[in-house]
Amino acid sequence: MGSTLATHFVKLGAKVILCDRDQQGLVDTYWRCHALSDQVAYFHLKDFSPESIETLLDMVEQKFERAPDVLINNLPSAPLPSLVDEKPSEQFIQQLAAIASSLFNFSHACSRMRQRQTKGVIVNVVCYNTVQDRSGIVSANSMVSGFTQSWAQELTPFNIRVGGVVPQIASANDEIVHWSEMREELIRNTEYIVSNEYFSGRVMSA
C-alpha cells in the first residue's frame, strides 16, 4: 500500500521522500518511483524512535532546504491476539504500542518543524494486506480516529491539518475483489485530504 501511495503522488508531480525500516522494500519502491520522476529520495530507518526520526527530518531539511509539507503515515494492520488466548497481553501491548509510537513520533517531529514554516498536513492511513490482518483493523481504526481528532485540535492554531483514512471491514466472500477497490479508494481519499484545505479533524472510510 505504501508503494502504491508513493507512485500515485509521484505521478501527480509531487516531490516524494520515502522512509521505512524494510530496506529492500524501500529500495524497490524508490526505483519504481524513480522510473516515473527524479523528484524522489529515500531514507532507511533502523527504528521509529524519536531520535531516528529527528535525524531523518534534519537530513531532509538539509537536502531540500525545507520541512515536508505533507506527512503520510501508512500503517499496515496486523492480527491482534484474542481475549480468550492463553497469554495475549504482552503481544497485544507490543503491537498497539508499535502503532501508537510510530504515529506519534512522526507526527510530533513533523508538526514541530512545520510550526517554523507556513502550513502542512498530516494524513494517517490504515491498511491491511492479508485476510488475517483484518482482525486488527477495528483497533487500528479506532486509534487513528482518536489521534486524528485530538491532534487536529492541537495543531489548528499552527495551520497544520490532520486527517485520517481507514478501511471498512469486508466479508471474507468478497475479499479479493473488495481489496483492489478499497486500495484505490484509500488513495483517492488520501489525495482528497491533501488537496482540500478545509479538511481537518475527520476520518474518511474506504
Regions found by a protein language model. Give the residues of each.
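A short helix-coil junction within the Rossmann-fold of NAD(P)-dependent oxidoreductases
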Residues: 12, 63-66, 81-82, 105-118, ...
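Catalytic loop of short-chain dehydrogenase/reductase
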Residues: 76-77, 85, 91-95, 102-104, ...
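Rossmann-fold cofactor-recognition segment
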Residues: 33-51
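C-terminal helical subdomain
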Residues: 101, 157, 164-165, 176-206
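Conserved glycine-rich Rossmann-like NAD(P)H-binding loop of the short-chain dehydrogenase/reductase
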Residues: 14-28
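Glycine-rich NAD(P)-binding loop of the Rossmann-fold in SDR/ketoreductase-type enzymes
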Residues: 48, 94-102, 181
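Canonical Rossmann dinucleotide-binding motif of NAD(H)/NADP(H)-dependent dehydrogenases/reductases
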Residues: 1-17
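A glycine-rich helix->loop->beta "capping" turn
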Residues: 36-39, 56-73, 79-80, 161, ...
